[in-house]
Amino acid sequence: NIRIVTYRNPTPTVDIIIELIDRRDRPIILIERLNPPYGWALPGGFVDYGESLETAAIREAQEEVGLDVRLIEQFHVYSAPDRDPRQHTISIVFIATATGTPIAQDDAKSLGIYAPWEIPPALCFDHGQIVQDYLQYRHYYRRPGIK
C-alpha cells in the first residue's frame, strides 16, 4: 500500500524590475496584462519545474518584453497569501538592467516605459508596493523590512 500525500503549497513566481540603462533616468518597464487580473504590472511569471529562479526571471523578461536582461540582484521576497487573487504565490523580485527597445509579447497586451515619478498609481497584485519599495531602495538605499 502506497499512500500519496498531497500538500497545498504556495507557487513560486518571479517579478523583474527592468531598468533601461541606455535611457535618461533609468526608467523601468511595466506591462499591461492580456489575461486576468487585468491592469499594469511588472514583467514576471511562474517558475517552471526544474528551472532556477534566475533562469525563470531571464526567460520571463524575454517572453514578455523581448529583451535580454542582466540580473543585478535579488531584491526582495513578497509572500502575503492574498498578493495574487488567483492563488497563493511567493514572488522573488529581481532588479535587472537592459538596453534597447522593449516590445510587448506573450501575455503582455502592451507595455510602458516609466521614469520613477511617472509610475501609474494602481498596479496589479502587490506590484505597487514592490515598486514603492524599489524606489525607496533606489533613492535611499533602504531595503524593505520584513512585514
Model-identified regions with their sequence ranges:
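A short coil-to-beta-strand element that immediately follows conserved catalytic motifs
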Residues: 67-76
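Acidic, metal-coordinating catalytic segment for phosphate/diphosphate chemistry
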Residues: 1-17, 23
